[in-house]
From Swiss-Prot:
The gene is HAK1. GO terms for cellular component: membrane; plasma membrane. Residues 704-717 have a biased composition (Polar residues). GO terms for biological process: potassium ion transport. This is Potassium transporter 1. Pfam families: K_trans, K_trans_C.
Length: 801
C-alpha cells in the first residue's frame, strides 16, 4: 500500500520508542515540532518585572481608556433614579447609600479584586473567559484541535490536579455534555450581544446628557433642538472612527483626569456648603429604611441606581492594554474617590434643592444663584469638559465593541468581514466598517426616538446588568475548573454577586415596556445571526470532514483523465480543514486540469489564546511524494492577532516553507529506522468519529484527525520505506523562489450551502434564508483577507447539510 505516514513524537501507536526518541532529540523548526515547542512568550504589561514607574504610568493612561463611561455616569444617575421627583428628603440618603455600596460591591470587590485575575494572558472580557475555559476543557464546536496547538507559547496551562476530583469532574461534564457546551456558548454570544447594545446606547445617553446642560445657559432651547445637536455630534463621532484614535488618544487620560478633578471638586464644595450630614449614607441601615419607606417604588428605582456602574466591564475587557496593578491603583485612587465625592455632593445639593433632580449635575455647579440657575464661571469649562468626556466614553465603548466583534469572528460566529487595524502602535485598535455603520445608525435612531436620558437609561441598564451576570457565571466555571478554589468561596462569590445582579435585573425588567425592550431586540437579532452562522459553519466543517479525499488518492487524482498539467507559479488553496484534502480540490482539478508547480493547502486557524508568536505562526506538512511539491500549511492566529497583508503573508509563508524543506532533510538519515517502526497508514483514522453526546470530537478522535495518528515530528514517509525524491535542498529552495517570481494565485471556494430535503422547517429557515442572507450581504470573503482580484480564482461548490 503506497501511502504517506506521519510519525508522532511521543506515544504514537505503531512507533517504536527508539524512533520516538530520535524524533524528540532533533530540534526541528518546522511547524509540527520545533516551532510548536518554542516558548517565546508575548510581552505584556502584566509581567512581574514591570517597575512601579511603568505601573504608575499605565495607571494614569488607564484613566482615559477604561473609565470614561463609569466616570460620566453622574450626568444622569439621579435623574434616572427619580424620574417622578423626590418623594421624601431621606430618600436621597438611601439612594446615595445604594450608589456607594453598588460601587463597592460590583466594580471594586467583584471586578478589581477578583475578576481581573481571570485574564487570558493579559486579555480580558467575556470572550477571553470562554477561550480560557476552552483550553482546559474541549468545549469548542469546531473539531480542528491539534496536539501541536497545546505547545504554542501562552497556550500551555497547568492541567487540573488529579487530587482535585471536583475539577476533573467538572472538566468531564463540560466535555461530555452537549447541553453544557451549548450553555457556555450561549452565555458568550449573549454577553457579546449585550456589549454591542452597550456600544450603541453609551454614545446616545452620554452625549445627550452632556449636551442637555446647554439649556442652563440657553433655556429657550427646546428638547428637540438638544436632540438634533446630539445627533450631529454622534454623526461626527461615528464618521471619524475609520481614522482611529492614534493621533488624539494621548489626550484621553489628561481630559478624563481633568473631568475627575472637576466633579470631585464640585462634589466636595456641595458637601461642605449644603449638608455635610449626608455622609451618614455610609451606614447601610439607610438602605433598609429606604425600601421600608418606598416598597415597590424603591425596588423600581434600582434601575436608575445601577447606571452608576456602567462601563465596569470595560475595566476587564481593556485589561490587555494595562496590567492588574495599574487598574487597581487607578480605580481605588482616582475613579472611586472622584465619583463618590460627586454623588455625595449631588445628594447634599438635592437635599436643599430637590426640585432640580431632573438636571442635578449642571444645576449643582458652584456659582452665583439667580432663580436657582447657575451662571458661575465654572459652567462653561465644565460643560466643555463634559462634552469631551462623553465623546471619550463613547469612543472607548466603540473601540471595545469593535475588538470584541473581531474576537467573535475568530470563533466563527459572524460572517468574515474585513477588520481594519487603525493603529500601528496600539494593538487591539480596530475598525469594522459594516458594524460602525449599523451601530451609528442605531445610536442616532435611539437618540431621536427616546429623546431623554431617562428613557434611554431604562434600556441601558439591561445591557449592563446582563453582561455582569454572564461574567459571574463564566467566572464560577473558572473557579471550579481552573482556579480550583474551595467550594465555600465559590458559593459565596456566586450567591453574593449573583443575588445582587438578579435584584437589579428584576428591577430593570419592570421597565420593559418603557424602553427595556430595546436591548432584548438587539440581543435577539445579534444572537440569531451569530448562532445561525456558527451552526452552519460547524455543519459545513463536518460536511467537508466527512468528504475529505485521502492523501493516498492524491496521485490517482492528479493523473486521471490523461493527467494534470503543472503550470508555473504558486497556488494557495484556502480551506477550513486542518487535515485531509478538501472536497474542493477534486472539483478544481476536474474543472481546470492544471495545478501550480508549488501547491499549498492553506488553513487559517484561530487558537483560543490572545496572541501567537510570528515564529510559531505556520505548521507545514508534506502531502504525498516530495517530488510533487504539494504541501499543507496551517496558519495559526490568536483571537487578537491581525492577518497580514497578502504580500507579507506570502513572504512569511515562503520563508517558512523553505525552512521546512531545509530541515526536512535533517531527518533523511533516520528515515529507515522510523520506517521500520511505522505501521501502514490507515486513512480511516484521519476521519474523526462523532461523539454520541456532542458535535465535537472525543480526545482520541481529535488526535487521529489532526495528525493522521501522528503529530509532533511531522516526518513524511513513503509506506514501503522508499526514500523521498532525491533533489538538492538548495536547488529545491531556488525552485520555490523561481515559482514565486512567476506569480502567486489564491484559490478559494464559493460555497453555496442549503438544507437537506428532510430538514425541519426551522433548519430550512436558518440555512436557506438567514445564513444565505448574511453570506450574500455581509461576507466579504477574499476582501476580508485583502486578496487582490487579479490574483484570485474562485471555484463554486454546493454543500447540502
Amino acid at each position: 500500500m503506497s501511502s504517506a505516514l506521519e510519525v508522532e513524537g511521543s506515544g504514537s501507536p505503531g512507533v517504536e520508542p527508539a524512533a520516538t526518541a530520535t524524533a524528540s532529540r532533533l530540534k526541528r523548526h518546522d511547524s509540527l515540532f520545533g516551532d510548536a515547542e518554542k516558548v517565546s512568550g508575548g510581552k505584556h504589561h502584566g509581567g512581574s518585572a514591570v517597575s512601579w514607574a511603568v505601573t504608575l504610568h499605565l495607571a494614569f493612561q488607564s484613566v482615559g481608556i477604561i473609565y470614561g463611561d463609569i466616570g460620566t455616569s453622574p450626568l444622569y444617575v439621579y435623574s434616572s433614579t427619580f424620574p417622578d421627583g423626590i418623594g421624601h428628603r431621606d430618600d436621597l440618603v438611601g439612594v446615595l447609600s445604594l450608589i456607594l455600596y453598588t460601587l463597592i460591591i460590583i466594580p471594586m470587590l467583584k471586578y478589581v479584586f477578583i475578576v481581573l485575575y481571570a485574564n487570558d494572558n493579559g486579555d480580558g472580557g467575556t470572550f477571553a473567559l470562554y477561550s480560557l475555559i476552552s483550553r482546559y476543557a474541549k468545549i469548542r464546536m469546531i473539531p480542528n484541535q491539534q496536539a501541536e496547538d497545546a505547545m504554542v507559547s501562552n497556550y500551555s496551562i497547568e492541567a487540573p490536579s488529579s487530587q482535585l476530583r471536583r475539577a476533573q469532574w467538572v472538566k468531564h461534564k463540560l466535555e461530555s455534555s452537549r447541553a453544557a457546551k451549548m450553555a457556555l456558548f450561549f452565555l458568550t454570544i449573549l454577553g457579546t450581544s449585550m456589549v454591542m447594545g452597550d456600544g450603541t446606547l453609551t454614545p446616545a445617553i452620554s452625549v445627550l446628557s452632556a449636551v442637555s446642560g446647554i439649556r442652563e445657559k440657553a433655556p429657550n432651547l427646546t428638547q428637540t433642538q438638544v436632540v438634533l445637536i446630539s445627533v450631529a455630534i454622534l454623526f461626527m463621532l461615528f464618521s471619524v472612527q475609520r481614522f482611529g484614535t492614534d493621533k488624539v488618544g494621548y489626550t484621553f487620560a489628561p481630559i478624563i483626569s481633568v473631568w475627575f478633578l472637576l466633579i470631585a471638586g464640585i462634589g466636595l464644595y456641595n458637601l461642605v456648603v449644603h449638608e455635610i450630614t449626608i455622609l451618614k449614607a455610609f451606614n447601610p441601615w439607610y438602605i433598609v429604611q429606604y425600601f421600608r419607606r418606598n416598597g415597590k417604588k424603591g425596588w423600581v428605582s434600582l434601575g436608575g441606581v445601577v447606571l452608576c456602574v456602567t462601563g465596569t466591564e470595560g475595566m476587564f475587557a481593556d485589561l490587555g492594554h494595562f496590567n492588574i496593578r495599574a487598574v487597581q491603583i487607578s480605580f481605588n485612587c482616582i475613579l472611586f474617590p472622584s465619583v463618590a465625592l460627586c454623588y455625595i455632593g449631588q445628594a447634599a445639593y438635592l437635599r436643599k434643592f430637590p426640585e432640580n433632580v431632573s438636571d442635578t449635575f449642571y444645576k449643582s455647579i458652584p456659582g452665583k444663584y439667580r432663580d436657582r440657575l447657575n451662571f458661575g464661571p465654572l459652567f462653561w469649562p465644565t460643560f466643555i469638559v463634559a462634552i469631551l468626556a462623553a465623546i471619550i466614553a463613547s469612543q472607548a465603548m466603540l473601540s471595545g465593541a469593535f475588538a470584541i466583534l473581531s474576537k467573535a469572528l475568530s470563533l466563527g460566529c459572524l460572517p468574515r468581514v474585513r477588520v481594519i487595524h487603525t493603529s500601528k502602535k496600539y494593538e487591539g485598535q480596530v475598525y469594522i466598517p459594516e458594524v460602525n455603520f449599523m451601530m451609528g445608525l442605531a445610536s442616532i435612531i435611539v437618540t431621536i426616538a427616546f429623546r431623554t436620558t431617562t428613557s434611554i437609561g431604562n434600556a441601558y441598564g439591561i445591557c449592563v446588568v446582563t453582561t455582569f451576570m454572564v461574567t459571574t457565571h463564566l467566572m464560577t466555571v473558572v473557579m471550579l475548573l481552573i482556579w480550583k478554589k474551595h467550594l465555600v468561596f465559590i458559593l459565596l462569590f456566586y450567591c453574593v454577586f449573583g443575588f445582587t445582579e438578579v435584584v437589579y435585573l428584576s428591577s430593570i425588567l419592570s421597565k420593559f415596556v418603557d424602553g427595556g425592550y430595546l436591548p432584548f431586540c438587539f440581543a435577539m437579532v445579534l444572537m440569531t445571526m451569530m448562532a445561525t452562522w456558527h451552526y452552519v459553519h460547524v455543519r459545513r466543517y463536518w460536511y467537508e470532514l466527512d468528504h475529505i479525499v485521502p492523501t493516498a488518492e492524491l496521485a490517482s487524482l492528479l493523473e486521471e483523465n490523461g493527467g494534470v498539467r503543472r503550470v508555473p507559479g504558486v497556488g494557495l488553496l484556502y480551506t477550513e480543514l486542518v487535515q485531509g484534502i478538501p472536497p474542493l480540490f477534486p472539483r478544481l482539478v476536474r474543472k481546470i486540469p492544471s495545478v501550480h508547480a508549488v501547491f499549498v493547502f492553506i488553513s487559517i486557524k484561530h487558537l483560543p489564546i490572545p496572541h501567537v508568536a510570528a515564529a510559531e505562526r505556520f505548521l507545514f506538512r508534506q502531502v504525498g511524494p516530495r517530488a510533487r511539491r504539494v504541501f499543507r500549511c496551517v496558519a495559526r492566529y490568536g483571537y487578537t492577532d491581525a492577518l497580514e497583508e497578502p504580500r507579507e503573508f506570502a513572504a512569511f509563508l515562503v520563508d517558512g516553507l523553505k525552512m521546512f524543506i531545509q530541515e526536512e532533510s535533517a531527518f533523511a538519515p533516520h528515515q529507515e529506522m522510523i520506517d521500520a517502526a511505522a505501521d501502514d497508514d490507515d486513512e480511516a483514522a484521519a476521519r474523526p468519529r462523532r461523539s454520541t453526546s456532542s458535535a465535537v470530537h472525543s480526545e482520541e478522535a481529535i488526535q487521529a484527525a489532526s495528525s493522521g495518528r501522528t503529530t509532533a515530528s511531522s516526518v513524511q514517509l513513503q509506506a514501503g520505506g522508499e526514500p523521498p525524491a532525491a533533489m538538492d535542498v538548495e536547488e529545491e529552495k531556488r525552485l520555490i523562489d523561481r515559482e514565486v517570481g512567476r506569480g502567486v494565485v489564491y484559490l478559494m471556494g464559493e460555497a453555496n450551502v442549503s438544507a437537506g430535503p428532510n430538514s425541519s422547517i426551522l433548519k430550512r429557515i436558518a440555512v436557506n434564508y438567514i445564513y444565505t442572507f448574511l453570506r450574500k450581504n455581509l461576507t466579504e470573503g477574499h476582501r476580508a483577507l485583502a486578496i487582490p482580484n487579479d490574483q484570485l480564482l474562485k471555484v463554486g461548490i454546493t454543500y447540502e447539510i
